[in-house]
């Protein structure tokens, strides 16, 4: 585990300090949950220089539009993961996909279980893909609401919302404000 910096951004220097010859894989979330911060392409490229596999979890990609998937053709040690849980409403069905260099994909295909997607998940996935235009229009509505909510939260005394690229907003409450809201 690598602590993020005071702005909840990825701390590359801290990640490098934790890296040693036993480190084989590093997971990075982008957008990060609960902060909604994006890992920059330059930060990911810097991590890719280390002798390990970098997995970037882009579960909230559809809400951010920010991705490092284009780097997979350049870096054999990069895996980008996506899920249908958030934008397509398939949480709990364990349906997603990975974007990676063909060499890694071939290796993973050799070691994966033969039936790695359940029937319910597959059926839901196919139905979702048939109506992806509708689902993506819902994503746009959520993005609009996120912006509206962020603006409203900025006007509440004692509440400091953090900008987010996810479908959520992290808020900081002034002292005892969280207790007041809880009792509310």
Identify what each model region corresponds to.
Residues 1, 28, 56, 80-82, ...:
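Hydrophobic residues in well-ordered beta-strands that form the structural core
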Residues 4-62:
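Active-site phosphate-binding strand-loop segment of PLP-dependent enzymes
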Residues 21-22, 50-51, 74-75, 111, ...:
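Structured helix-beta-strand junction loops
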Residues 31-34, 86, 167:
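Short glycine-rich anion-binding loops that position phosphate/pyrophosphate groups of nucleotides
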Residues 68-77:
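Short, well-structured N-terminal submotif of metal-dependent ribonuclease cores
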Residues 77-155, 159-162:
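PLP-dependent aminotransferase class I/II
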Residues 142-143, 155-184:
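Conserved PLP-binding catalytic core of the aspartate aminotransferase-like
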């Amino acid at each position: 585990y690598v602590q993020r910096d005071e702005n909840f951004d990825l701390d590359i220097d801290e990640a490098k300090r934790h890296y040693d010859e036993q480190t084989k894989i590093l997971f990075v979330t982008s957008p990060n949950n609960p902060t909604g911060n994006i890992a920059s392409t330059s930060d990911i490229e810097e991590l890719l220089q280390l002798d390990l596999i970098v997995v970037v979890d882009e579960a909230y990609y559809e809400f951010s539009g920010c991705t490092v998937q284009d780097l997979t053709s350049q870096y054999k040690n990069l895996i980008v993961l996506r899920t249908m849980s958030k934008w397509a409403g398939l949480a709990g069905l364990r349906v997603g996909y990975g974007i990676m260099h063909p060499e890694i994909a071939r290796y993973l295909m050799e070691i994966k279980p033969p039936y790695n997607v359940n029937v319910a998940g597959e059926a839901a996935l196919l139905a979702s893909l048939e109506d992806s235009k509708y689902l993506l229009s819902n994503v746009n509505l959520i993005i609009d609401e996120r912006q509206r909510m962020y603006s409203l939260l900025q006007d509440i005394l004692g509440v400091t919302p953090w900008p987010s690229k996810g479908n959520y907003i992290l808020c900081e409450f002034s002292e005892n404000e969280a207790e007041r809201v809880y009792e509310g």
